């Protein structure tokens, strides 16, 4: 009896240890990674204040998560642990491997897509649902939620930022090209029938690493297919921006990507 209790206790301890949140931190920031491989929050530490970036905790919106749309709606795959701070998931023969890594002093993700199937992978779109809590539904909670303010796909790289109503700014950058970006809205409601009010609150910001053509000319035009045995790699970093006016300079210093700053666009 005692031996059985000892075995059960050991198993329960192992399960609780596996389910614990992983704390990943450096001097200027701290990330909490859930047992499911998604982020719970990022805290950027400053001398005057800390900026906390919240992430969704519910299964439908938490992230980063690998997803693909093959023509019949989005499919999202669960992460399987695959090493320290590393996870993998598979959709339609394509494996996505995500590893949390420090990059240029910033919290970042290395994302690898590899086609292990027998046919070319040609999704409507596929990539990451970032999982940043963008849902603004009530006062005063929305002051701490990050709204996708600017996202820009270039042929050689990607950059953008999210901003809270209270003025905090979070930059997102990749030195590799990203096909497109998109957002998911809440479902909406009928009130009264038959009138349907479409949802307008953002439930997810997505980085579409791949997207079917056509795309705007400024977007990369070769990320619509992943051939058998082919793999592509992206680094995606989160960057704390001191003020919105320092966005271009900060992103350029961190990632080395070309940026244009236009303090004024109209002269009278």
Segment roles from a protein language model:
Residues 1-21:
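Bacterial Sec-dependent N-terminal signal peptides
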Residues 243-268:
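Extracellular ectodomain segments of secreted/surface proteins
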Residues 19-110, 114-188, 224, 228-230, ...:
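Beta-strand-rich N-terminal accessory domains
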Residues 4, 124-126, 248-254:
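Composition- and surface-driven signal marking solvent-exposed, interaction-prone regions
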Residues 238-242:
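Short, charged beta-turn/beta-strand-edge "cap" motif at the junction between a beta-strand
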Residues 209-218:
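Short beta-strand and strand-turn-strand segments in soluble, beta-rich domains
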Residues 195-207:
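Short carbohydrate-recognition loop motifs
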